[in-house]
């Protein structure tokens, strides 16, 4: 099981995954905006077990965004 972490504090702009979805290492999972800069979050290949945030949520650095098996 792998935790997908936020690279920085900011706001979730996009959530591009849902539970049960199979992802690859090139998939853009989330977009986190901080100080008007957008940062794309990628993850390890696997199946999304749970998504813990939604668009508009404020997140902290290293906060768990999703769990992938």
What are these regions (language model features)?
Residues 1-11, 28-45:
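Short beta-strand-turn/beta-hairpin segments enriched in glycine/proline and small hydrophobics
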Residues 17-23, 53-59, 63:
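Acidic, glycine-anchored pre-beta loop/turn
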């Amino acid at each position: 099981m792998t935790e997908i972490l936020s690279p920085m504090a900011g706001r979730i702009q996009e959530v591009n995954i849902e539970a049960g979805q199979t992802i690859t290492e090139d998939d853009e999972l989330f977009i986190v905006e901080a100080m008007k800069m957008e940062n794309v979050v990628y993850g390890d290949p696997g199946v999304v077990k749970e998504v813990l945030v939604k668009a508009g949520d404020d997140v902290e650095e290293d906060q768990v965004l999703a769990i992938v098996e």
